[in-house]
Amino acid sequence: RCRVHLYRLCRVAEAEGILLVMESLRDDESNLVYDLPRAREMYRQIGHPNLKMMVDNIATGAAGETLEDWFNAFGDDLIHMHFLDGDPWLHNVWGDGNTSLSRQLQIMQAHHFTGYLVQEVADEHYFTDPFSADRRNFRVLERFLED
């Protein structure tokens, strides 16, 4: 049923001139698409040019996968990313987890990634002072930005 509805949504997206992006979740969040093999199979079965992929590096870490695995699977159809520092379960600001920011950026550069990066800082320990968390996050990211 999910595939049928996703395909229908893709046809509407095509008529509207937009793309849909599918995200893989963790296995405690979904029973449909929670790892690379299931994402690849759903993507293949939908088979519509208006369906693209996104990667959440928290979900990939929890599944024991890498960003490289996802680029190898989807190539240029990987256009969006929840880009966080995981442990791998928490949605941390950069510097609070154990994900290598420099390695993630190297992989994106090697694959000429020009898609969107979203900071989905959603762990509850940031809720009391989100401004401070954002400030710390951007200070870490600034070290990797070019003028």
Where are these regions (language model features)?
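Generic enzyme active-site microenvironment
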Residues: 21-22, 54-57, 118
